[in-house]
């Protein structure tokens, strides 16, 4: 994702909220030379849930590069709070987000091209994705729905 972001023409920043070891960070620098791109910011780990929610709410978009694992909690949180979600095109992610997100693959320039595309996307179109994402969460992943499904399962 870092290399693809670096190839994009966006003037937006890429804030990476993650914990990385020094060894991994050095390897990443060697492979990508990301430190030469002032748009890339390693924020570190954010444990304060209120702060994390504010970061999400104010983010222009969210990159989700997870390939395995089913329904990913960070993807659900992003869909519920971030207007524009750019997801790696794998079955798990498509099943969760359906048409409420945009998809990229690991081909060269796939993500960079998508970043350039959304950088020029009209606000109205972004708002439509946001509405679809929030609707998807409410209709398929809300606590009320999940509890009702489990309750019906246990009763039967």
Regions found by a protein language model. Give the residues of each.
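Short hydrophobic signal-anchor/transmembrane segments that target glycosyltransferases
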Residues: 1-13
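Nucleotide-activated donor-binding/catalytic signature segment of Leloir-type glycosyltransferases, i.e.
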Residues: 18, 27-50
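Active-site donor-sugar recognition loop in glycosyltransferases
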Residues: 47, 51, 66-71, 92
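Short alpha-helical segment that forms part of, or immediately flanks, the ligand-binding pocket
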Residues: 53, 73-80, 91-95
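Acidic donor-binding loop of glycosyltransferase active sites
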Residues: 54-70, 83-84
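Short glycine-rich donor-binding/catalytic loop of glycosyltransferases
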Residues: 67, 83, 87-94, 106-108
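Conserved acidic donor-binding segment of nucleotide-sugar-dependent glycosyltransferases
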Residues: 101-109, 117-123
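A charged, aromatic-enriched C-terminal amphipathic alpha-helix characteristic of glycosyltransferases
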Residues: 123-155
């Amino acid at each position: 994702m870092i290399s693809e972001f670096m190839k994009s023409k966006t003037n937006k920043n890429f804030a990476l909220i993650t914990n990385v070891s020094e060894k991994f960070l050095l390897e990443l620098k060697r492979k990508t030379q990301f430190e030469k791109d002032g748009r890339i910011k390693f924020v570190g780990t954010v444990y304060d849930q209120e702060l994390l929610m504010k970061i999400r709410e104010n983010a222009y978009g969210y990159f989700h590069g997870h390939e395995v694992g089913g329904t990913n909690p960070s993807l659900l949180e992003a869909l519920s709070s971030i207007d524009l979600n750019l997801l790696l095109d794998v079955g798990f992610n498509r099943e969760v987000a359906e048409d409420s997100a945009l998809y990229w693959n690991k081909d060269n320039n796939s993500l960079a091209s998508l970043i350039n595309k959304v950088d020029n996307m009209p606000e109205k179109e972004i708002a439509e994705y946001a509405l679809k994402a929030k609707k998807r969460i409410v209709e398929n992943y809300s606590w009320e729905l999940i509890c009702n499904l489990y309750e019906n399962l246990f009763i039967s």
